[in-house]
Curated annotation (Swiss-Prot):
Organism expressing this protein natively: Panax ginseng
Assembly description: Heterodimer of an alpha subunit and a beta subunit. PSII is composed of 1 copy each of membrane proteins PsbA, PsbB, PsbC, PsbD, PsbE, PsbF, PsbH, PsbI, PsbJ, PsbK, PsbL, PsbM, PsbT, PsbX, PsbY, PsbZ, Psb30/Ycf12, at least 3 peripheral proteins of the oxygen-evolving complex and a large number of cofactors. It forms dimeric complexes.
SUPFAM superfamilies per the UniProt record, alphabetical: Cytochrome b559 subunits
Organism placement in taxonomy: Eukaryota, Viridiplantae, Streptophyta, Embryophyta, Tracheophyta
Any one GO BP annotation for this protein: photosynthetic electron transport chain
UniProtKB keywords: Chloroplast, Electron transport, Heme, Iron, Membrane, Metal-binding, Photosynthesis, Photosystem II, Plastid, Thylakoid, Transmembrane, Transmembrane helix, Transport
UniProt-annotated binding residues for heme: 23
Protein's name according to its UniProt entry: Cytochrome b559 subunit alpha
Essential cofactor(s): heme b
Purpose of the protein: This b-type cytochrome is tightly associated with the reaction center of photosystem II (PSII). PSII is a light-driven water:plastoquinone oxidoreductase that uses light energy to abstract electrons from H(2)O, generating O(2) and a proton gradient subsequently used for ATP formation. It consists of a core antenna complex that captures photons, and an electron transfer chain that converts photonic excitation into a charge separation.
MF (Gene Ontology): electron transfer activity; heme binding; iron ion binding
Length: 83
């Protein structure tokens, strides 16, 4: 026989009016906040990733791929100078 922990059952929670009043506001708000975070470009600034139009510049059209096994630091320096 299982004991009672005093917690409400999941079915009781999701059928309550209070749950839906709270979540009908918070879930769309989180979605809108995430959409604004990405669409305004703030996500690019916060995480430091390049914007889609900044991957390839006029000077650098190739992929920055390290091909040398024994001189990777030289290639990294060369790539960083092109930024």
């Amino acid at each position: 026989m299982s004991g009672n922990t005093g917690e409400r059952s999941f079915a009781d929670i999701i059928t309550s009016i209070r749950y839906w009043v709270i979540h009908s506001i918070t879930i769309p708000s989180l979605f809108i906040a995430g959409w604004l975070f990405v669409s305004t470009g703030l996500a690019y600034d916060v995480f430091g990733s390049p914007r889609p139009n900044e991957y390839f510049t006029e000077n650098r059209q190739g992929i920055p791929l390290i091909t040398g096994r024994f001189d990777p630091l030289e290639q990294l320096d060369e790539f960083s100078r092109s930024f």
